[in-house]
């Protein structure tokens, strides 16, 4: 048996071969979970109403303090719209609190207060793009459901974050106006503002984490009586059922939230490299790799996606033998292909719901920096005949957060 056949059989045996992720079936399941979530009948997709219309609201020249609490970084800026064009100024980026170790809600509020202190003289409006699950209120506050992406902030679940922030800032800004929006919804709004709104729109985040938001008819949001047309935050990373392989289960067991966000753990930048590492460990124990490669893998405690991108692009990764290179590159490419198939299935479900061309604003490092993944996804979109026009908004999350605060 030749080496490529051995690798294919191995990947099939441990459940990571791309052929095991059927785009048609997963798309059908995804659409069914969307319906369940919109009806309020439970299911793996929360389908959270945002109460924000899909068309950017009329905006004035009033500046807005825009915050972006992402999976890796926390950004803050002052955003002002002039003749409908967003201008982003005073942009600062720091590491997202709670990634290096657990912090308290009080610590997080103090951090935000410190970040925006100098900007309160410019604006009393704050728009927060929050990349974690929360229930929106009609007043555009957000009650936190849970965190993900390995971020830990104790005491935050169940809290109305805007109300808590107003309390923390009462002495500095008693007249504060606050709006909270999810990252995918902010990306959708930011894309519409920066690139133009021409039809059904969606926002896709595929970076440290995974999520998607899209415009939905009010009549379809059955769990919300008398709803108007609005953006729905899918919380797509929680989708299930999925064809989990052995490496997925091993990775899930060592995360901070085992059993949660299965799709995110199969696709996003925080986890894909770790799935590759688990697969390579299994390949080593199965005798597919040389002793030199086995030693290298055994010494690695983690493998970020930027490292798997690097290994895919060099001639002799790890052990250096031709067989090692074939095993390692085939496993990485196959896991990327599988991830792209899963995202394509999600997009197919949303496209079928839209019924016409979908204008998709994409944000996140996996799409823009992992060229192998991007090429695989764009190829699959074309092969499946999906009518998608994808676009990039330079500061979509900040722009979208500002628009939410002006709504």
What name fits each language-model region?
Residues 1-125, 170, 193-194, 238, ...:
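ATP-binding/phosphotransfer module of carbohydrate and carboxylate kinases, centering on a glycine-rich
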Residues 62-68, 125-127, 177-179, 201-205, ...:
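Short glycine-aspartate micro-motif
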Residues 74, 133-137, 210-213, 241, ...:
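Short, acidic Gly/Pro/Ser/Thr-rich loop/turn segments
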Residues 78-80, 129-130, 182, 205-207, ...:
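Glycine-rich, histidine-containing beta strand-loop boundary motifs that form or position
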Residues 86, 150-154, 189-275:
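Glycine-rich phosphate-binding loop of actin/hexokinase-like ATP-binding domains
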Residues 93-110, 134-202, 223-239, 374-375:
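Glycine-rich phosphate-binding loop and adjoining helix at the ATP-binding site
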Residues 131-136, 184-187, 365-368, 397:
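Short, internal active-site loops enriched in acidic
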């Amino acid at each position: 048996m030749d080496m490529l056949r051995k690798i294919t059989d191995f990947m099939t045996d441990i459940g990571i071969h791309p052929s095991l992720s059927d785009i048609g079936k997963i798309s059908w399941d995804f659409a069914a979970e969307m319906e369940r979530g919109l009806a309020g009948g439970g299911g793996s997709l929360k389908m959270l109403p945002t109460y924000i219309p899909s068309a950017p609201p009329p905006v004035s020249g009033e500046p807005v303090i825009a915050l972006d609490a992402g999976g890796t970084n926390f950004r803050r800026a002052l955003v002002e719209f002039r003749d409908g064009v967003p201008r982003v100024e005073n942009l600062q980026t720091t590491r997202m609190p709670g990634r290096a170790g657990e912090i308290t809600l009080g610590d997080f509020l103090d951090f935000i207060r410190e970040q925006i202190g100098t900007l309160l003289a410019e604006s009393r409006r704050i728009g927060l793009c929050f990349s974690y699950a929360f229930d929106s209120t009609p007043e555009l506050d957000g009650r936190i459901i849970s965190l993900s992406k390995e971020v830990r902030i104790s005491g935050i679940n169940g809290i109305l974050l805007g109300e808590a922030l107003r309390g923390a800032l009462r002495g500095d800004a008693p007249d504060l106006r606050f709006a909270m929006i999810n990252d995918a919804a902010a990306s959708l709004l930011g894309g519409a503002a920066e690139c133009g709104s021409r039809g059904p729109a969606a926002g896709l985040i595929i970076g440290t984490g995974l999520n998607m938001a899209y415009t939905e008819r009010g009549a379809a949001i059955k769990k919300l009586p008398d709803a108007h047309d609005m953006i729905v935050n899918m919380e797509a990373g929680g989708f299930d059922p999925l064809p989990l392989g052995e490496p997925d289960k091993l990775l899930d067991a060592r995360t901070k939230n085992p059993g949660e966000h299965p799709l995110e753990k199969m696709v996003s930048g925080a986890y894909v490299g770790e799935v590759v590492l688990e697969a390579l460990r299994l390949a080593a124990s199965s005798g597919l790799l040389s002793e030199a490669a086995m030693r290298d893998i055994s010494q690695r405690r983690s493998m970020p996606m930027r490292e798997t991108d690097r290994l895919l692009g060099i001639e002799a990764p790890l052990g250096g033998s031709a067989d090692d290179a074939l095993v390692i590159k085939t496993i990485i490419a196959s896991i990327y292909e599988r991830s792209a198939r899963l995202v394509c299935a999600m997009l197919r479900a949303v496209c079928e719901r839209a019924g016409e061309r979908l204008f998709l604003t994409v944000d996140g490092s996996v799409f823009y920096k992992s060229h192998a993944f991007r090429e695989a996804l764009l190829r699959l979109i074309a092969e499946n005949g999906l009518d998608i026009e994808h676009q990039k908004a330079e500061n979509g999350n900040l722009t979208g957060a500002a628009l939410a605060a002006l709504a």
